[in-house]
A protein has these predicted regions:
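Gly/Trp-centered helix-boundary motif
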Residues: 1-112, 116, 138, 142, ...
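Residue-level signature of the cytosolic catalytic core of signaling kinases
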Residues: 16, 59, 78, 121-124, ...
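Amphipathic cytosolic juxtamembrane alpha-helices at the membrane-cytosol interface
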Residues: 21, 83-98, 102, 122-130, ...
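Residue-level recognition of membrane-helix boundary sites in multi-pass small-molecule transporters
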Residues: 34, 95, 125-126, 141, ...
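Alpha-helical transmembrane segments of multipass membrane proteins
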Residues: 44, 48, 116-120, 147-151, ...
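Transmembrane helix-loop junctions in multipass membrane proteins, especially transporters and channels
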Residues: 51-59, 120-127, 153-154, 177, ...
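Generic hydrophobic transmembrane alpha-helix motif, especially the helices
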Residues: 75, 109-111, 119-187, 215-218
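Glycine-rich helix-loop "coupling/hinge" segments at transmembrane-helix boundaries
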Residues: 137, 148-152, 165, 180-181, ...
């Protein structure tokens, strides 16, 4: 095998596997990120596994318990029409997580494709894609989503909401990926692939995307929290998930008016929203430090650990 062929084929598999193990070990040393990941997985499992085990469905009415506080029968209490708040909160958490992960996945795929194509091809293709990015960035995306999302009914409204949020959430990431691609296309392994007749699609999938995978993973993780907050804001204003379905945003909106007199209508959905966004951000920060140990957070954490023995010795 010649040196050029080795460059084109990329790093050997054992080296890539070793790097993955190193990143995983760095991530595990970040306790806040690990706690955030565990909490996020527990909420994800609970939102899907617990509802079938509950006595009451999220739409079922209990006319003997209207606006009752948390009890053994209704652990999170009931609302104005006797619906179980625990069942509704789990249903809302489930919908918000589905929307958050789906929007983050769609926006990351669109950003990876648009940014890598624009950066690799250049010329009029780059100009056209960046013109579209600039156009979408100046458009009032919140108003557009608010106008079109409620027009669909049932599960179609959630699907349309995911598509709209994902369609307006990829532009900034695409700019970042384009800049990275402009740098990578001048590297020796990309030039060698061109000389050997590799197609643009092969170069993107084999050489460009694997080298920016860490950035995509971090961006996707952080986008989950942003998408959940966006859906919550739309649902809070009545433009997101439509009745009879619920999300954390609709539960917060319906419980805000009674937050002081009947706090259980508001605090459980609000608490899960805060916890979900916090956990996704902790995981995203942990992944960033794991992939880029030279980042400011990682350096400051190492300095703190190095200062601990010195402080103990001085004491």
């Amino acid at each position: 095998m010649t040196e050029t062929e080795m460059i084109v084929q990329g790093a050997p598999e054992p080296m890539a596997a070793g790097r993955r193990k190193l990143v995983w070990r760095r991530f595990l040393r970040n306790k806040p990120a690990v706690i955030g990941l565990i909490a996020l997985l527990l909420m994800l499992v609970a939102s899907f596994a617990l509802p079938p085990l509950l006595k009451y469905d999220y739409q079922q009415l209990d006319y003997t318990a209207l606006l009752k506080p948390p009890s053994g029968r209704h652990p999170f209490g009931t609302n104005q029409i006797g619906q179980d708040v625990l069942a509704q909160t789990l249903r809302g958490l489930q919908k918000s997580l589905i929307i958050g992960f789906s929007v983050a996945f769609i926006s990351s795929i669109m950003a990876a494709f648009a940014g890598s194509v624009a950066g690799l091809l250049g010329g009029w293709t780059d100009t056209a894609i960046m013109w579209l990015v600039d156009l979408l960035l100046v458009m009032p995306s919140f108003i557009i989503v608010a106008l079109f999302a409620p027009r669909a009914k049932g599960s179609g409204s959630i699907l349309l909401l995911i598509v709209l949020l994902g369609g307006f959430g990829w532009m900034i990431s695409a700019r970042l990926i384009r800049g990275l691609t402009l740098s990578l296309r001048e590297r020796e392994f990309v030039r060698a692939a061109r000389y050997m007749g590799a197609s643009n699609w092969t170069i993107i999938t084999t050489h460009i995307l694997p080298n920016i995978a860490s950035i995509l993973i971090i961006d996707t993780t952080l986008a989950v929290g942003a998408a959940i907050m966006g859906e919550t804001g739309l649902s809070y204003l009545g433009f997101g998930v439509q009745p009879p379905d619920v999300s954390l945003g609709t539960l917060i909106a319906s419980g805000t008016k009674s937050a002081l007199t009947y706090p259980w209508l508001f605090m459980f959905a609000g608490g899960f929203l805060i916890l979900t966004v916090l956990c996704t951000n902790l995981v995203g920060d942990g992944l960033r430090d794991a992939f880029d140990p030279g980042s400011q957070r990682a350096r400051s954490r190492r300095k703190d650990k190095a200062a601990e023995p010195a402080g103990k010795a001085a004491a």
